[in-house]
From Swiss-Prot:
Family, per entry: Belongs to the EMP24/GP25L family.
Main location group: Golgi
Cited SMART domains: EMP24_GP25L (SM01190)
Domain of life, per lineage: Eukaryota
Source species of the chain: Schizosaccharomyces pombe (strain 972 / ATCC 24843)
UniProt-recorded name of the protein: Uncharacterized membrane protein C16E9.09c
Topology feature Cytoplasmic, residues: 207-215
Domain GOLD, chain residue ranges per copy: 29-125
Keywords attached to this entry: Endoplasmic reticulum, Golgi apparatus, Membrane, Signal, Transmembrane, Transmembrane helix
Entry-linked Pfam families: EMP24_GP25L (PF01105)
Positions of transmembrane segments: 186-206
């Protein structure tokens, strides 16, 4: 978590064209993520220093190389820049697509990875044009606005579907109640007709029995 916050702060400094520095511990790379628009040219200088125990200070060494690598994380880590630089050499690359880019720094020396040498790297990066930074911020803000608008549209659609579902449920309930009411009325009518029929038949049988003197 601390490394992520550190990386975010570093990139904030980078794209305000302020020099920062960080340390390499052995052969572990330092990587940072940054959202950048398409066509942004990033330029800068890297300065690598090595700890000198005899002098008890950091000194610049031509034996130190810094490998700078830039990948597009949104395109299966597509590599757009890779270069081995010596101290005070320039970094220069242009983004080919909009999205999150990962910039990694690795310390090397004489073709081998550092195993225990302490290295301090100074980095000063900036975009080629302030307009790009403004455009990037505007694009991010527009993207966020579009997402909010899309969410609002989706929410309205969901609410509309819920209202339609409620209307259908009310219609179904009314239809069901009406059908049940008709069934009950028809059942009552059938019972009444059946009772009347039974009474008439009993009365008819009684008269028949009396007439035939069976009772």
């Amino acid at each position: 978590m601390k490394l992520g916050i550190f990386g975010l702060l570093l990139f904030t400094f980078f794209f305000q064209s302020q020099a920062v520095h960080f340390y390499f511990d052995g052969s572990k790379p330092k990587c940072f993520l940054k959202d950048m628009p398409k066509g942004m040219m990033v330029t800068g200088i890297v300065k690598a220093e090595q700890w000198n125990n005899e002098a008890n200070k950091w000194v610049t060494s031509n034996n130190i190389k810094i490998r700078v690598q830039v990948d597009e994380t949104f395109a299966n880590n597509h590599l757009i820049y890779k270069n081995d630089l010596r101290s005070n050499e320039a970094v220069r690359f242009t983004t080919t697509n909009e999205g999150t880019h990962r910039i990694c720094y690795l310390s090397t020396s004489d073709g081998a990875w550092f195993s225990s040498t302490k290295t301090r790297l100074h980095v000063d990066l900036a975009s080629d044009d302030k307009y790009n930074l403004i455009a990037s911020s505007e694009d991010e803000a527009k993207d966020l606005t579009d997402r909010v608008a899309a969410l609002n549209t989706r929410l309205e659609s969901i609410l509309g579907e819920q209202m339609l579902q409620r209307s259908r449920e009310m219609t179904f309930r009314d239809t069901s109640e009406s059908a049940n009411s008709r069934v009950v009325r028809w059942t009552i009518v059938q019972i009444v007709v059946l009772l009347v029929t039974c009474i008439w038949q009993l009365s008819h049988l009684q008269r028949f029995f009396v007439k035939e003197k069976l009772v």
